[in-house]
Amino acid sequence: RCRTRAKTPRNLALADSLVDKATEIIKYFKSKNPDLIWFIENGDSTMLWGREVAKDLSNYVRLDYCQYNGPGYRKRTRIAHSDNIIWNPRPLCDPKTCKQCVDGKHILTAQQGPGKRNGTRTASSLDTCTLDTLHGLPRELTEEILRICQQHIWEVL
């Protein structure tokens, strides 16, 4: 995929090595605790999910941050998880009914600079997100993940 505004080239070797290390850590701790619960999050439309390094990340859910009262943008993401949990996330966003949309458009775009509206770049400083905002999980999503983990613990006991 072409990144027309990218300032640096993709480093797929580095990205793959990070995923390899994460799966290595998961396998190590799973050998110590076969009931281990784990999660790996990455954007839904990223190249990761089609790469060889992600072939074992086959249990996943797709969700939109806006459905968890996130900061105002959609950000569709994919969260791979261990096969010992059942997770039915909230439905994907429908801009016609989404509480974070005005006239069918999300109030923010998931990027650091101003976004586009109707094909033209906006100059609004209100449509600018900090890196911390973009990297954070919505509180309600974090709470849902915690409930899944707590429920699993009680099932095991």
What does each of the following model-derived ranges do?
Residues R1-L157:
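Conserved active-site and SAM-binding loop architecture
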